Amino acid sequence: MKVDGGLGPDLSHDLGTFAAQAAEQEAAGYNGIWTAETNHDPFFPLLLAAGTTSDVDLGTGIAVAFSRSPMTLAATANDLQAFTGGRFILGLGSQIKPHIEKRFSMPW
């Protein structure tokens, strides 16, 4: 059985702790580490995690697709895939119309 962990989506988590959290989760035997788009960008914590891990999969679960340019999103995913040695998994979601229009100021 595979068990995955995550890097703190709640407001009390400090970005400075994410690298250590990732290393602890890998040492504990987790198979993957996931982030979500909440109060932090979902990609940056994975970059931090990549620097302190070597085997776990690293993924977004989820990143909001409609608030980003497809080319920018593809470039970010490609860079993370290269930097992690193929361990990055891109999870995308659509979000709901009010969040896209109000939170991200993007057209629906």
Task: Label every model-predicted segment.
Residues 60-61, 91:
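A conserved short beta-strand
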